Amino acid sequence: MNMNIDAEVLIKEAIEARKMAYTPYSHFKVGAALLTADGKIYRGCNIENAGYTPSNCAERTAFFKAVSEGERSFAAIAIVAGPENGDLVLTAPCGVCRQVMMEFCDYETFPIILGISPNDYKIMTLKEILPLGFGPKNLNIEL
C-alpha cells in the first residue's frame, strides 16, 4: 500500500459516511471513503429503495460523486459496514461495486481497506477481490 495513504483517516471518514446511510429495509449500514490521487476524499453511503434494484451501494455512491465532479484518478477506498444497531463487520464490496472500481482504478494495486475500526482492518487489492476481472483492457481500450 502507498505510504501516503492513511488507512485510519479513511476508515474514520467511512464511519462518518455510514451515519448518513438510508436503510429502512435491511438496516445494514455501509459507509465508504474514496481517496483521489490528489488527496481529496469523497464519502458515500448505501441508499435503499423499496424496489431494491434502484438501491445504491456506498462504494458506488462515493465513486459517482467523485466522477461527477471530474475526478478520474483514485488512490484507495475504505469501507465499513454493519447492522444498524450492531458492531461493524468485515464486509467486501458487492460484484457491481467491484466492476465500477475496475473501470476507474489500477487493477493490480488499488487498495481496498475493509474496516472494523480505525485500528482493525484488512487491506486487499482490486485484483485480489476480483480475480480475472473484465475491464477496458479486455476491449483493447486504454483509458
Where are these regions (language model features)?
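Zn2+-dependent cytidine deaminase-like catalytic core
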Residues: R43-N138
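Short beta-strand scaffold segments in enzyme catalytic cores
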Residues: K29-L35
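Short, basic/aromatic recognition patches
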Residues: E8-T23
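Short beta-strand-to-turn element immediately C-terminal to the catalytic PLP-Schiff-base lysine
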Residues: L35-T36, G115
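Feature of Fe-S/electron-transfer and energy-metabolism proteins
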Residues: M1, I5, V9, D120, ...
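Charged, amphipathic alpha-helical segments
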Residues: A7, K12, G95-Q99
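Active-site segments that bind and position negatively charged phosphate/pyrophosphate groups
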Residues: S26
